Amino acid sequence: VTGDKTFTPAPVEIAACPVEEAGIHPSADGTSVTFALYDLDTDNNYKDYACLIGDFNDWELSTEYQMKRDNDKHFWWYTVTGIDPAKEYGFQYYMGSEKDGNVRIGDPYCEKVLDGSNDKYLVEQGVYPASAIQYPNGKTTGIVSVFQTKPASYNWQVSDFKIDNPDNMVIYELLFRDFTQVGSELATGTIKEATKHLDYIKSLGVNAIELMPIQEFDGNNSWGYNPCYYFAMDKAYGTKEEYKQFIDECHKQGIAVLLDVVYNHATGSHPFAKLYWNSKESKTAKNNPWFNVDAPHPFSVFHDFNHESPLVREFVKRNLKFLLEEYKFDGFRFDLTKGFTQNKSNESTASNKDDSRIVILKDYYKTVNTTNPNAVMILEHFCNLDEESELAKAGMKLWHNMNES
């Protein structure tokens, strides 16, 4: 139901969680799935209870789907059985708190979401298939996560692509929407349409495409610097399979594909933001273990990640590894890395050498390099030369010599 009807939770059952990582974990045969959600704030408190709601229980709150608590891993967890491996299911976590109020959130590690406010336009214009799972209108509110325990696997035609010379890339920055869209017709600014023009891009002497942010962002019409779900690619441009087909086709033509990633901040739609949220101030709450209430630097928008938090570091590194392995991206352009710091600064001091920021970026680069030694990591940094030189010596590349010509 869309409203928060009266629900009396059962006493919380304390039990060891059978999985080691937060997220969605299908069984080997695909007939069951274990969900695990991290919940522990900076005051060492957690919500009063958590329930699963979704297509598997017709979105009804019930003690049958009340999640168990593992206080060692700080997880809420539950195993749902009777799953059809060939079917997509929508679901949310319903988090109950007498102190903070109740909230419905998706899973931060899900690979697809449904948006009741925006998906209908994608269906109407043929960008997202009408035959695919749709938003459960009238049964819940907010963004819905999707899982399938046995999805069809993509058959990569090129599985071993490598950048010939990472120091000699001619990069074409591409926004799917603007590259081919005609007027307001969403169906003309898609992955499918862009794929048709790869010959043109190659004719320019380009050997790498840098996709502007495509991880799930608020709305349908955006440059993508307002991310909310990092493991889900935005449906505004096409399906997961179409994203992979685009990358595969680029690799066939000798073109690397880099992804512009936005880890400085996220919108209030992100599950980590919603879990500990100050509704009076429209900001992340002081006890949120992932976000700062206010950015310590002067360049932030939306809600600023605390990159000193082990939780944030783990999340970012897990996401980088996922993108390299699942989509075979050849590297990344990191947006606004100057903001990866907890040291307070102003416009005059933000570019000064920051040793803690260097440590953070080296940590992320290690994950990239370990996962794919050929992958590149380009920083939009614009800090003092002593800091940029140290990052460059570590193997990272930096925007430099910028001009307006």
Which residue ranges define each predicted feature?
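Conserved alpha/beta catalytic core and glycan-binding cleft of carbohydrate-active enzymes
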Residues: 328, 355-405
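Core domains of carbohydrate- and sulfate-ester-processing enzymes
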Residues: 91, 95, 100-158, 272-294
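Aromatic-rich carbohydrate-binding modules that target alpha-glucans
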Residues: 13, 35-88, 96-119
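Exposed beta-strand face motif in extracellular beta-rich ectodomains
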Residues: 1, 87-91
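Non-catalytic, glycine-rich low-complexity segments
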Residues: 7-45, 134-136
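Substrate-binding/active-site clefts of carbohydrate-active enzymes
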Residues: 110, 114, 153, 157-166, ...
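Generic enzyme active-site microenvironment
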Residues: 171, 258, 333, 378-379
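Short, solvent-exposed loop/turn segments at the edges of extracellular beta-sandwich modules
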Residues: 1-6, 98
